[in-house]
UniProtKB/Swiss-Prot annotation:
Enzyme Commission identifier(s): 2.7.7.18
Species the sequence originates in: Geobacillus sp. (strain WCH70)
Pathway of action: Cofactor biosynthesis; NAD(+) biosynthesis; deamido-NAD(+) from nicotinate D-ribonucleotide: step 1/1
Family under the similarity heading: Belongs to the NadD family.
GO MF term list: ATP binding; nicotinate-nucleotide adenylyltransferase activity
Intrachain disulfide bonds: none
Name of the protein this chain belongs to: Probable nicotinate-nucleotide adenylyltransferase
Pfam annotation, one family: CTP_transf_like
Origin: domain of life: Bacteria
Catalytic activity annotation: nicotinate beta-D-ribonucleotide + ATP + H(+) = deamido-NAD(+) + diphosphate
Keyword hit for RNA-binding: no
Coiled coil ranges: none
Protein purpose: Catalyzes the reversible adenylation of nicotinate mononucleotide (NaMN) to nicotinic acid adenine dinucleotide (NaAD).
């Protein structure tokens, strides 16, 4: 049985914090692979503007290209409407009955578990992995495995904000992602500022 870590998110854009978290969980739990799973419309972000799926997918492909055990699962991008983890995990289990899935969430999402769609059924299908973050607790009544990860205080929203303000994002995202953002003028990028 293969142990697969599922790392869902908008990845708008993917950054070194995502890669660090995925790599630490991969090794801490001795997983076979990490599958990054970009969502089309996450239920908790239905009213936020999200960058086009094609751009987010391409940035993710670029970001993980050099890691042999990182892969992308596009099942949620292909589904219309909001992406519910319960539906996704059921579909993945039917496609890969020989896999055991570990769903990776940051400590900031642990407190929302009681509000997740069909959470009682979901915890029977998948093992949740809570990654500790400063200022958030991984304490919950639901069974989760905890993983300590070195802190890297960066977020996708902070990166988008820095790009909008014309500030550098070098060393916050892989260089290939930075160049893609610049080339596609995502988040209001201006080449002359972001090249620094």
């Amino acid at each position: 049985m293969r142990k697969i870590g599922i790392f869902g998110g908008t990845f708008d854009p993917p950054h070194y914090g995502h890669l660090l978290m995925a790599n630490e969980v991969l090794h801490a739990l001795q997983l076979s692979e990490i599958w990054f799973m970009p969502n089309r419309i996450p239920p908790h972000k239905q009213h936020e503007q999200v960058t086009k799926s094609e751009d987010r997918l391409r940035m993710l492909e670029l970001a993980i290209a050099d890691h042999p055990r990182f892969h992308i699962e596009t099942i949620e991008l292909e589904r219309e409407g909001p992406s519910y983890t319960y539906d996704t995990i059921r579909q993945l289990l039917s496609m890969h009955p020989d896999h055991e899935f570990y769903f990776i969430i940051g400590a900031d999402m642990v407190e929302y578990l009681p509000h997740w769609y069909k959470i009682a059924e979901l915890i029977q299908l998948v093992t949740f992995v809570g990654v500790k973050r400063p200022g958030f607790s991984t304490e919950t009544s639901y069974p989760i495995m905890e993983v300590e990860v070195p802190q890297f205080a960066v977020s996708s929203s902070m990166i988008r904000d820095r790009v909008r303000k014309g500030q550098t994002i070098r060393y916050l995202v892989p260089e290939c992602v930075r160049l893609y953002i610049e080339e596609r003028k995502l988040y209001g990028a201006r080449k002359s500022v972001n090249s620094r």
